[in-house]
Amino acid sequence: MAAILARKSLSALRSRQLVLAGQAWQQGANTSNGTLLGTRTFATNDSFSTDKDDEEREQLAKELSKDWNSVFEQQINTLFLTEMVRGLMLTLKYFFEKKVTINYPFEKGPLSPRFRGEQPLRRYPTGEERCIACKLCEAICPAQAITIEAEAREDGSRRTTRYDIDMTKCIYCGFCQEACPVDAIVEGPNFEFATETHEELLYDKEKLLENGDRWETEIAENLRSESLYR
């Protein structure tokens, strides 16, 4: 790289010198012709270099100096590995600063009360199922992930005999929670439910009720905190 820059600089300087030599020779020839013809000439500023020539020389000198400075700086960086040292210093700086990550899964960040995760089916405090088999959640689900079957009980109330959710279809839009008149189906706080098989993601009623029993305290608190905005 240094050799290329030096070669270019010398070529530019040689070209400039040839141009100046040609101009000087032309001026000398004109002066000789004027003397032979008896024309009296006097030395003026035009016989020497003009301001434009001086500016061009200064500009050329600056460019040469700039090129050599860049070559020198590059050689210094290569010799003393300054760029590597600069990178190591940056690493050392962040080594002692406060960490921006957490040690997942042993540490977990906070979740919003509006977080939409794995769904549960809730119960009343008495243990009775909340779901009344109105099928509004099944009707509003855009992914058609919910399947409900129901029958009437002896007391005349309706309860589900089948409540399935295909978690591979669910898009966690929360429409089922908004449509439910009794807060039976909600979006839960759990996001860690990866499985090894597809069948494990086909949730039945027992699985959903089990989720509801596990997270009831947290779900009730989230619904209470968000009740002002519903």
Curated annotation (Swiss-Prot):
Residues that hold [4Fe-4S] cluster 2 according to the record: C141, C170, C173, C176
Cofactor binding summary note: Binds 2 [4Fe-4S] clusters per subunit.
Organism (species): Nicotiana tabacum (Common tobacco)
Transit peptide, UniProt annotation: 1-42
Cofactors: [4Fe-4S] cluster
SUPFAM superfamilies in alphabetical order: 4Fe-4S ferredoxins
Biological role stated in the UniProt entry: Core subunit of the mitochondrial membrane respiratory chain NADH dehydrogenase (Complex I) that is believed to belong to the minimal assembly required for catalysis. Complex I functions in the transfer of electrons from NADH to the respiratory chain. The immediate electron acceptor for the enzyme is believed to be ubiquinone. May donate electrons to ubiquinone.
EC code(s) of this entry: 7.1.1.2
Cellular component aspect of the GO annotation: mitochondrion; respiratory chain complex I
Predominant place of localization: mitochondrion
Key words of the record: 4Fe-4S, Electron transport, Iron, Iron-sulfur, Metal-binding, Mitochondrion, NAD, Oxidoreductase, Repeat, Respiratory chain, Transit peptide, Translocase, Transport, Ubiquinone
Subunit structure, as described in the record: Complex I is composed of about 45 different subunits. This is a component of the iron-sulfur (IP) fragment of the enzyme.
InterPro entries assigned to the protein according to its UniProt record, in alphabetical order: 4Fe4S_Fe-S-bd, 4Fe4S_Fe_S_CS, NADH_quinone_OxRdtase_chainI
Source organism superkingdom: Eukaryota
Any one biological process term the GO annotation gives: mitochondrial respiratory chain complex I assembly
Chain residues that bind [4Fe-4S] cluster 1: C131, C134, C137, C180
Entry protein name: NADH dehydrogenase [ubiquinone] iron-sulfur protein 8, mitochondrial
